[in-house]
Each structure stands twice: as C-alpha cells, then as structure tokens.
C-alpha cells in the first residue's frame, strides 16, 4: 500500500481481512462471507468512532445482502455535507469490487460514471484485485470512498456544485418571509 498515509495504513490494518471466497450465488459460502463482511464493518466503524472519524452509516437493504444502502458525509470548512450511498454486490464478487454510488452527485464531477458511480479504476481497483478475496465492503469504503470524498467534496463545494443543506434552505426561507411580508401589506 505504497502511497497511503500512515493514518490510512493504520486504519486498514485494524480492519479484519476476509477469508471466504464467495459471491451472491454461492449459497452457504455467501452467508459465511456476509458474516465476515459484517464483522469487518463493525470493526471499521468501531475504529472510526474511537478516532472521532465517524463518517458513514450502511446496512444491507435486502436479506440476501446483495444491495447496500446508507449515508456518508464529509466535513469541509466545518460544515457537514451528507450524501445517500448505495451499491449492489456484483455477481463476480469478491473478484470484482462493488461500484459505490452517490446518486445525488451524479453528473457533478468528471470522476464519476453514469448513475452516480464513483470512479475508482486508477487507484483502488488494482489494490482490490491484488488483495482478493481478503478485502470486503469495509475496505472498499476505507480505501475507495473515503479518499474519493476527501478529493472531490472540497472541489464540488468550492465550485458551487454542492451546497450545504443550510444554504439551500436559506433562499426558500427568504422567499417565504418576503411573500409573508407582502401578504401582510
């Protein structure tokens, strides 16, 4: 993991590696893999909370564990920007990494594919391939989504492509106040 900062290496070292090579079509082996995925996610979340770096919530959206949904956030200029997060587990998983989607950012950056899938091809996918099947969902979040958010959110905010929820509500509140004062006249 050359090129990663010490903090990232430290966190990745605390996420348990997975051992079961199984995908959604592998029956009982997939259920075992899901147990390992949950253990790794719980460990990663615990590490983040202990370091005051809590930045996502995620859970399986179906009983099979093939669809995942949640929320991730990034703090920029002391303001928290939240984004819905989703992805499907590919049929060829774990050989193929999940394609993480942030649908509300679709079309706002060049480092994203259609549908809001974040671009992970250059930096993350070779690392995933090298560490298959030991990497799982927690590793995809840590080494894929987290650096992507750190690189892209400040640019999107500074360019005006992403607005803080308080800034979006302010014009609507001002318009309501203006129409209220006009009605009172």
Swiss-Prot record:
SUPFAM superfamilies associated with the record: UBC-like
Organism: Oryza sativa subsp. japonica
Name of protein: Ubiquitin-fold modifier-conjugating enzyme 1
GO molecular function, one term: UFM1 transferase activity
Role: E2-like enzyme which forms an intermediate with UFM1 via a thioester linkage.
Family of the protein in this entry: Belongs to the ubiquitin-conjugating enzyme family. UFC1 subfamily.
Any Pfam family: UFC1
Keywords per UniProt: Ubl conjugation pathway
Active site per UniProt: 119 (glycyl thioester intermediate)
Alphabetical list of InterPro entries matching this protein: UBQ-conjugating_enzyme/RWD, Ufc1
């Amino acid at each position: 993991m050359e090129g990663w900062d010490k903090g990232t290496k430290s966190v990745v070292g605390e996420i348990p590696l997975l051992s079961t090579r199984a995908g959604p079509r592998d029956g009982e082996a997939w259920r075992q893999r899901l147990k390992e995925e949950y253990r790794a996610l719980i460990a990663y979340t615990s590490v983040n909370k202990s370091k005051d770096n809590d930045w996502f919530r995620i859970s399986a959206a179906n009983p099979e564990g093939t669809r995942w949904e949640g929320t991730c956030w990034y703090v920029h200029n002391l303001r928290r920007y939240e984004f819905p997060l989703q992805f499907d587990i590919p049929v060829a998983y774990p050989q193929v990494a999940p394609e993480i989607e942030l649908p509300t950012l679709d079309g706002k950056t060049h480092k994203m594919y259609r549908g809001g899938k974040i671009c992970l091809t250059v930096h993350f996918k070779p690392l995933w391939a090298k560490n298959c099947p030991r990497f799982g969902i927690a590793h995809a979040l840590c080494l894929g989504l987290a650096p992507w958010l750190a690189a892209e959110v400040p640019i999107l905010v500074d360019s005006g492509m992403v607005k803080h929820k308080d800034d979006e509500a302010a014009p609507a509140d001002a318009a309501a106040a203006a129409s209220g004062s006009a009605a009172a006249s």
